[in-house]
């Protein structure tokens, strides 16, 4: 018999592979950081031995979820400004609060708290854009989470850098510092067309090309932005991106609410990736992204929560439920966004958006061992006829029982194993006191 590091025995395994393999009374064998084999419990009891056996009975076992767009450290700003339009929210509340409060300490503890929230709701990989991203990388590494992240680039000063050139230099340092890390990858991340000059966008694109990494930005989040960009640029957003050489397979575009039919065809032809953020777009009344049309055209679309200041949580199960239902009611068509499609957006398609589809997002031999166990032995999850329906319309993040990332168990029976959750919450409560005091100052 072959010895492996960990055996998961029993339960329903959803592989989310090319054939959407489903195995009842399934099993996983883990060797080091990777999946050695996927099969049945009966087969594996005869084939493998392990000192670490996890009982998967009454569990749903699937790839860890991929949060394709968030701002992790903004857990520290959860609920400080709600019920207002995007530009008012950003310009009069979020940017001033960040200018007064964001420092390495806030970003580290806020990001670590986000990791706690994400792991406990089944997310194993996330894509982050924020300030002092070295601290987010450090927090993710401590938590044991997989991530793609980048320092947000602006034309104007941020709490971390004074000029666009400093921001690009900081990004270059991140690319060097985290090169080859097993969990942390770096992207180049200009904030948006309305906060970045053509020259900054061009240099960002050149840096992404030099290192062959993704370039991620917010794009056409609402109709006001679309109108503003037309006036500022004298052309539409995608024409500008095309002129700058940014429309290619490395582009990850967040939101994409105002893509028209021609834009969608361009995304398809150029291989650009998109991220759907329905709850944030609803809360800020930004509009409806044309997600069904993008999917029909074969565009790779992931699912993201956005940050805690505009959602206000990081639970991708809740996001899946909203994503499915919102598109149905928008078009008055219950067949749109079927559950299986939405689960793929939150797993294998999300991994593809981030350029990690050879690493995570599905369960098969050779892939990194990023997976979750959902406890089905609960009243609201009994009985189960269709596991994909369950995942989208019934499961809550709190139903996640056990989480593995890169072959390591990071949560067991709802208890985090890689860091002190209580200490993290205490630190964020302390930071929140100075944030609260700063909000009393006039803008």
Curated annotation (Swiss-Prot):
Binding site for Zn(2+): 69, 71, 218, 306
EC primary class: hydrolase
Domain of life: Bacteria
Cofactor: Zn(2+)
Binding site for substrate: 98, 191, 221, 306
Catalysed reactions listed for this entry: S-adenosyl-L-homocysteine + H2O + H(+) = S-inosyl-L-homocysteine + NH4(+); S-methyl-5'-thioadenosine + H2O + H(+) = S-methyl-5'-thioinosine + NH4(+)
Gene3D superfamilies given in the database record: Metal-dependent hydrolases, Urease, subunit C, domain 1
Keyword Hydrolase: yes
GO molecular function annotations of the record: 5'-methylthioadenosine deaminase activity; metal ion binding; S-adenosylhomocysteine deaminase activity
InterPro entries for this protein: Amidohydro-rel, Deaminase_MtaD/DadD, Metal-dep_hydrolase_composite, Metal_Hydrolase, MTA/SAH_deaminase
EC number: 3.5.4.28, 3.5.4.31
Cofactor: how and how many bound: Binds 1 zinc ion per subunit.
Transmembrane segments: none
Keywords, in A-Z order: Hydrolase, Metal-binding, Zinc
Function in brief: Catalyzes the deamination of 5-methylthioadenosine and S-adenosyl-L-homocysteine into 5-methylthioinosine and S-inosyl-L-homocysteine, respectively. Is also able to deaminate adenosine.
Family named by the database record: Belongs to the metallo-dependent hydrolases superfamily. MTA/SAH deaminase family.
Entries under PANTHER family matching the protein: AMIDOHYDROLASE-RELATED DOMAIN-CONTAINING PROTEIN, AMINOHYDROLASE SSNA-RELATED
Protein name: 5-methylthioadenosine/S-adenosylhomocysteine deaminase 1
Gene: mtaD1
